[in-house]
Amino acid sequence: GKMVTRSGGFLTSLYDFDAGFFRLSPREALSLDPQQRLALELAWEALEQAGIAADQLTDTAGRSVGVFLGISSIDHWQQQLARSPEAIDAYLATGSTHSVAAGRVSYMLGVSGPSLAVDTACSSSLVAVHLACQSLRQRECEIALAGGVNRIITPTASINFSKAHMLSADGRCRTFDQAASGFGRAEGGGMVALKRLSDAIASGDRIQAVILGSAVNHNGRSNGITAPSKTAQQAVIQQALSASRLSPHQVDYVETHGTGTALGDPIEVGALGAVFGEQNRDHPLVLGAVKTNLGHAEAAAGMAGLIKAVLAMQHRQIPANLHLSEPNSGIDWASLPFQLPPTTMPWPTAEGLPTAGVSAFGFNGTNAHVVLQAASPADSQSPPPPNQPPPNLADTRYLLPLSARTPTALTQLVARYAQHLAAYPDVSLAEVCFTASVGRSHFAHRLAILATTPTALRQALIDVLAGRPNPACISRHDVGTGSPNEAVNKDVAGQLSLTHWANRYIQGENLDWPTFFQQCFPEKRYQKQALPTYPFQREYYGP
């Protein structure tokens, strides 16, 4: 009845949540699985990172959005069922079941595309990505949110894994190391917004990477229900490469499943060797293992690997595999064209688009592999517009609209934007304002700032935080949100000043931002930028 370790990669503030933002009562929030809470926050942040306004995704807008959520832990469900009958409330089932975790995201957004909870254990989130891609190809949805979550609430699973000799004694993953003896459990979550590439290009979206292909299979009958299968792993990687129309030598990097177990590591390297083992490669295939950095996030593990691979391609740098002292002697490394990164290293080739594979294998026998490629500059970039007044506006300034559900959240959002502009002083002001306008939902507490340069905008934000007057700022007000109306569109066509437009925003009008930019900047095509996300106001909702 004991665990071999209490160490792991744990998140703080298990029960903290912004119930008000998601329109949940305190009573319902108390019964909500922390995994459901995390999924809601991740979905909102994924949309904001993509520059997609969540309030424009409702069914009335005619846009189909799918939700594919990897989720496996039943800690909260077990905890709720252990309560006395008198303590059971009306929210036990909806707050605990995995099906509702995905459904709640769809409900929150008001969308009616496919909504699936995926439980294939450690491969859940990567299987969710595979299913999301299939749904997009079949045109079941225009946008797909895919991800995974994992929170550890009780010691039950850790005791089970300890008795099954799965966990390392110090809670660390030593992937591919001679001392590998098990994995360390971890909490976490991640979610990505997916579109068909042609749609993302047409929308001027910020394309982070392109999924070329994916595959899913099962071990079938192997040495045991939880035992990995070299044959099945080899097959799923080959299927994903075939779906991507790539040859093995075109892949630069593989983010492995890499749990750091004495059984699993040699089997995985054996499968990789069977696919990528040709010695005539132009450069070694680098094998990464994010579990050495974060631990094993179980249902969210595949998402951690995918996000790491995307970031590595963007920065053209591969992070080190930690806890790697001596490569596993049970693996014939000399016969394989593989490289383990003991320190951060540059991307192995400077030519062509970086290409990577990501693996995730569930202990139920379900395997997944996804092949990614860095976004082409032609797809992901557009020439930055000059910081000069467009010819059809009376003002020479750009308008930044900011809003939040509460005054405190608005102040924190202002601070985040000021920090962002300090970190990226050469950012295109026009594209910042474009993204903040069309790529965000707009709430009751509002602020509008008019500026001609990023420096001037940052100074105005600093003045707002300090309580100093600045003529560039249109005072914030507590307003109700209205509906788009013909008067607003007429004002745009009439080329009224940005000050007038800002005042309408502050007064609570639900403005038609795409029409504004289309009519005021008809010859310009803006690229959505990475901007700060919403500052959730979390409070404690727990036992």
Positions of predicted regions on the chain:
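Condensing-enzyme catalytic core of the thiolase-fold
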Residues: G1-P391
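Short acidic, Pro/Gly- and aromatic-enriched capping/linker segments at domain boundaries
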Residues: P522-L531
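Flexible catalytic loop/linker elements that gate and position reactive groups at enzyme active sites
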Residues: P228-A243, T355-N510, Q537-Y540
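Helix-rich "cap/lid" substructures immediately adjacent to catalytic or cofactor-binding pockets
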Residues: S99-A102, T499-Q507, F516, C520-F521
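Acidic/polar, glycine-anchored loop/turn motif associated with catalytic or activation segments
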Residues: A43, W501, W513
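Residue-level marker of motif borders
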Residues: P114, D252, A360, P401, ...
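Flexible lysine-rich "adenylation lid" loop at the C-terminal edge of ANL adenylation domains
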Residues: L531-T533, E539-P543
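Short coil/turn segments at secondary-structure boundaries
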Residues: M3-T5, Q56-T60, L429-F434, C473-R476, ...
